[in-house]
């Protein structure tokens, strides 16, 4: 497609952390399943209405590349049917979702834990034909940043939102979905103000508001991989991309399994605490996310658990959304749609992972994260990040293997999304029951296979019944052992 010129009201440069090399060719899709028949036109019109309000117009702008290679957004004076705020496509199928060859393969809740196929098989439901695959596809066309694809069955609806990662992280899209729901319900007055289009809270991060905060040294500075060791790490990582394949699957853990894992973790922590402090009965706190992370780390290490690999160092990397952690920079009741997720690190080894209890490992993860989330430590981490060329920090050793986690549980998508004004009629209720117009299931995928999606877990969160869904990318040899262990779970 050739680039189309439209009257432009404003041109806004991308922020450094949005225009990152690692984000440019990541085009994401979030697919939500509703067991209701939804009005596709109402979904489209309400989204376009939101993107015509105030600073929300920025999300309807077109991505362009400057002569120096940097990205910017061209915000039109107004949107028209020929140049809409969001790209819309609709597929209407005259059958029930379970009668469709691909629809019947969508994951559903069961009594026992289960491994499902990768969500990548559902590309047919995710986007229109010939979707954008790279940032260049946006720069060289009139495509809006946001794509809306609706698949209508006679008893259910799939709603997919696609966007370039340069526009936002998952929390930003959650904010979009919440405000979209408000417009759909005729509550435009409740739509949050989107942050100023030409500023970014992270610009003032290091000094703090007023520049009065004292700079601390980052707690993990001595563990940074730099110099020749950094070069070795990069070479090893490139080698794994070339020679170590990855296989993606979706992990389903029922609510009762999560309760059992959490009870196991808490009981082992109480036992450990009583050994150190006799008579102490208080349970150290660990969250569902801590326990799931610890369990997933153990699953990822199963195929490496031998005497030869026990000393293999691992760096557990958790994504941190800094919006709620920096209240002096992020204003309340203001929407921030962008990339504000950064890394927290936990150092360990395969041997330590396999020899410690689930509770101890979960507590280790939680303790290391708590040490890194104070505002002064976040600022110290950003100071180190600004010194790097590649826009990422490597913690551990030159031979450390990264294990990456992104936890979307706090987005609470099945709770905060409310498309009930678009419900034409309820469909047949499945294993998971939700209120009309609320999702019963969701997954994410990339429009193009990502080589960097490896040794990673995306905790998608809970469905309305409290069951957890987790997407994972691991070497093929890891999955038989994981399946075997999952069969032992309650």
Curated annotation (Swiss-Prot):
This is O-acetyltransferase PaAT-2. Its EC number is 2.3.1.-. It comes from Phomopsis amygdali (Fusicoccum amygdali). PANTHER family: ACETYLTRANSFERASE MATC1 (PTHR31642:SF294), TRICHOTHECENE 3-O-ACETYLTRANSFERASE (PTHR31642). The active site is at residue 165. One of its GO terms (molecular function) is acyltransferase activity, transferring groups other than amino-acyl groups. Optimum temperature is 35 degrees Celsius. It comes from the Eukaryota. Belongs to the plant acyltransferase family. O-acetyltransferase; part of the 2 gene clusters that mediate the biosynthesis of fusicoccins, diterpene glucosides that display phytohormone-like activity and function as potent activators of plasma membrane H(+)-ATPases in plants by modifying 14-3-3 proteins and cause the plant disease constriction canker. It is an enzyme of class 2 (transferase). Keywords: Acyltransferase, Transferase. Pathway: Mycotoxin biosynthesis. Optimum pH is 8.5.
């Amino acid at each position: 497609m050739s680039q189309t010129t439209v009257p432009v009201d404003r041109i806004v440069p991308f922020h450094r952390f949005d225009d990152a090399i690692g984000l440019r060719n990541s085009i994401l899709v979030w697919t939500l399943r509703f067991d209701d028949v939804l009005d596709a036109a109402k979904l489209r019109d309400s989204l376009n209405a939101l993107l015509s309000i105030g600073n929300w117009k920025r999300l309807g702008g077109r991505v362009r590349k400057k002569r120096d290679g940097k990205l910017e957004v061209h915000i039109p004076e107004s949107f028209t049917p020929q140049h809409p705020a969001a790209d819309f496509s609709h597929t209407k199928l005259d059958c029930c979702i379970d009668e469709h060859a691909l629809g019947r393969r969508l994951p559903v809740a069961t009594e026992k834990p289960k491994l499902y196929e990768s969500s990548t098989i559902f590309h047919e439901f995710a986007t229109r034909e010939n979707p954008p695959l790279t940032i260049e596809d946006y720069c060289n066309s009139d495509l809006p940043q946001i794509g809306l694809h609706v698949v209508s069955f006679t008893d259910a609806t799939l709603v997919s939102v696609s966007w370039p990662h340069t526009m936002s992280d998952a929390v930003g899209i959650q904010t979009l979905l919440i405000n979209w729901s408000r417009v759909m319900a005729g509550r435009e007055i409740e739509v949050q103000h989107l942050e100023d289009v030409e500023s970014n809270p992270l610009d003032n991060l290091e000094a703090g508001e007023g520049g009065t905060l004292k700079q601390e040294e980052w707690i993990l500075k001595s563990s940074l991989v730099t110099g020749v060791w950094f070069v070795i790490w990069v070479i090893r990582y490139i080698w794994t991309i070339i020679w170590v394949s990855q296989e993606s699957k979706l992990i389903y853990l029922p609510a009762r399994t999560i309760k059992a894992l959490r009870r196991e973790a808490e009981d082992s922590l109480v036992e450990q605490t009583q050994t150190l402090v006799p008579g102490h009965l208080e349970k150290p706190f660990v969250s569902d996310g801590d326990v799931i992370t610890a369990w997933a780390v153990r699953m990822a290490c199963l195929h490496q658990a031998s005497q030869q690999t026990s000393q293999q160092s691992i760096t557990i990397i958790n994504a941190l959304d800094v919006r709620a952690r920096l209240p002096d920079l992020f204003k309340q009741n203001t929407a921030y749609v962008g990339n504000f997720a950064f890394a927290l690190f936990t150092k360990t080894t395969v041997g330590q992972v396999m020899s410690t209890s689930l509770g101890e490992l979960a507590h280790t993860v939680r303790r290391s994260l708590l040490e890194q989330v104070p505002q002064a430590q976040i600022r110290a981490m950003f100071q180190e990040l600004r010194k790097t060329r590649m826009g990422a920090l490597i913690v551990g050793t030159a031979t450390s293997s990264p294990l990456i986690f992104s936890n979307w549980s706090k987005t609470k998508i099945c709770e905060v999304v409310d498309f009930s004004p678009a419900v034409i009629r309820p469909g047949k209720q499945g294993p998971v029951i939700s209120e009309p117009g609320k999702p019963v299931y969701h997954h994410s995928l990339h429009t193009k296979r990502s080589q960097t999606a490896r040794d990673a877990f995306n905790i998608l969160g809970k469905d309305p019944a409290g069951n957890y869904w987790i997407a994972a990318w691991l070497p093929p040899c890891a999955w038989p052992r994981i399946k075997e262990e999952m069969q032992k779970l309650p």
